[in-house]
Structure formats: structure tokens, C-alpha cells
Amino acid sequence: MKNFHLAGIIPVHKNDFSFGFEWPDSLMPVASRLTAIERSVMECAWAGCETIWIICNDDISPVIRHRVGEMVQDPVWLRNMDTHPSMSRKPIPIFYVPIHPKHRDKIDCFGWSVIYGALSIFKIAVKMSKWLVPGRYYVSFPYSVYDPKVVRPYRKEISSPKGFCLSSDGKTIRD
């Protein structure tokens, strides 16, 4: 496949205010100066995603956009020892996709956000360029609590046209 593109999907569920704070649970800190959504963005970057798409409602999108931003640097391409380190960096754009109003509060769950996000990404990418059409999707849930660098050794397998699934103790999501 000549133009393989890996798109990262991060679903942010609207009804995730279970801790009682004014902000979504995806903005809860999981480490010093690191929120759950930022951890998920970094996981997508370590996995080799060329674009990252955050699927969230319009009401929480500005807060998440303010914290996360509109791009992240590919951590593999951060080379501080180059003569011009800023020239060798590879930015990864972050896009925000709102859930359609007819689906809000009716079909509002993580599974639907992933499916709706993949469909929206495909529709948008087809209209923009054939080089942006994803060959595969990498889904990162913001409520996973593990080091995002754990996917780095599998970057080549994740970024290939062949299907890939992480496992823990010999079990995958399929089990």
C-alpha cells in the first residue's frame, strides 16, 4: 500500500462527569502536569499516528482544545542533538470532531464515538485528499492509565496495513 495513513481516534464521552467536577473526566490529572486526554494524545503519537482526531461534543471541545492544542510533535522525531532540531521535528495535527446533534443524549457512548469518528474521518479525508484517507485507525481511550511509551516498540506493526492488537497477560480486547 503506497499511501498508508494511520489516524488516531480519541473518544471523549459527554456523560463522563462522575467525579463531580466542573470539567470532563478526560481532563483529570493522571501524573504531574499530565491529564488523561494528553496521555491519550501522546499514546497516539508514540503509536505513529499521522493525524489525531478527538471525538467530543461542542460544549467540552473548547476546554479540551485549550489544554491539548491543535498539534503535537512526534516524539520519535524529537532530535535535540541535530544542528537544527526544529527543522527535523514532525508535527502531528489534532482535529476535533463533534458528535452530530441528532445523536447527542441518544447514542452517546464510547463505542458509538469510535464508529462515528472513523466514519467522519473517512468522509472528511475523502473530500480533502486521497493521501489523507486512513488505511487503519488507532483508538486510544483517555481513561487508560499506563505509560504511553509502551506502544513505541510496536510502532512499526501498528503503522502497517496488517491488523494489530495489544495484549496483557496473553489476553487482548478480543478475549
What are these regions (language model features)?
Residues 9-11, 55, 140:
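Short hydrophobic segments within beta-strands
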Residues 3-5, 49-51, 134-135, 160-161:
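A general structural motif
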Residues 4-8, 21, 28-34, 61-96:
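Short acidic, glycine/proline-enriched helix-loop-strand junctions
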Residues 51-57:
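Short internal beta-strands
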Residues 1-28, 34, 38-39, 45-49:
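N-terminal nucleotide-binding beta1-loop-alpha1 segment
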